[in-house]
Regions:
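Signature of Gram-negative outer-membrane beta-barrel scaffolds
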Residues: 1-59, 74
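Surface-exposed extracellular loop regions of Gram-negative outer-membrane beta-barrel proteins
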Residues: 27-34, 43, 55-105, 116-117, ...
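Residues that define the transmembrane beta-barrel architecture of outer-membrane proteins
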Residues: 2-4, 45-49, 100-104, 111-113, ...
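A generic beta-sheet turn/junction motif
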Residues: 12-16, 57-61, 70, 110-114, ...
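Residues on the lipid-exposed face of transmembrane beta-strands in outer-membrane beta-barrel proteins
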Residues: 6-12, 53-57, 106-110, 149-155, ...
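Transmembrane beta-barrel strand/turn architecture of Gram-negative outer membrane proteins
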Residues: 45-60, 147, 166-175
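Gram-negative outer-membrane beta-barrel transporters
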Residues: 13-19, 28, 114-116, 121-126, ...
Length: 188
């Protein structure tokens, strides 16, 4: 597997509000040689444009931020190597589809004297999720939704006395549901 990527973005300021549209280009070349099938050679190339837009605004001593971005993950070399794990499963090769997603996030971050904080909510719509497990072939599972909240804070005790440590705390809540899809398996 070989990959190259590049991006362009622009910051547009409207007073305290900043808008940042951007575009990322990903180029992937994947090859597979199956030596157990007479050195069968497969090749697949992809060029993908991934748009995104983010915003931020300084309000009341904090920063509100958010964005919507397109995500893309091609099948890994490891998934391609063991696609046909198990008997009686469909033949597969480089026809495994890439995962695509829309990633949305909104949150606030700031500083209150001895406390840095950040709270964000997120929602991710994933299409063609690549999934596997014991006795299961890597296949495109289907559509999956994930959403949750991330909270992070740093207590800056070193501001009180230089010998005191800063203490960081983080928490993430994640809820995921399979909206549409089936796992193909040999497990009875």
């Amino acid at each position: 597997t070989a990959a190259a990527s590049g991006f362009i973005s622009e910051s547009i300021d409207f007073g305290p509000f900043t808008l940042r549209p951007g575009l990322r280009i990903e180029i992937f070349e994947q090859e597979r040689v199956d030596r157990l099938a007479g050195s069968l050679y497969q090749d697949k190339s992809l060029v993908v444009a991934l748009p995104g837009i983010a915003f931020s605004s300084n309000i009341m001593g904090g920063t509100i931020f958010g964005g919507i971005h397109r995500g893309f993950t091609p099948p890994s070399s490891g998934a391609l190597k063991i696609l046909n794990f198990g008997e009686g499963l469909e033949e597969s090769g480089l026809d495994l589809e890439a995962e695509k997603s829309w990633n949305k996030e909104i949150g606030i971050r700031g500083n209150l004297s001895l406390l840095d904080y950040e709270i964000a909510g997120f929602h991710i719509d994933i299409e063609n999720l690549v999934a596997a497990g014991r006795g299961t072939a890597f296949k495109n599972l289907g559509k999956v939704n994930s959403q949750g909240i991330e909270v992070r804070s740093d207590f800056l005790f070193s501001k009180l006395a230089s010998f005191l440590p800063n203490i960081g705390v983080a928490y993430t809540y994640l809820s995921t549901s399979v909206v549409d899809g089936t796992i193909i398996s040999n497990i009875q």
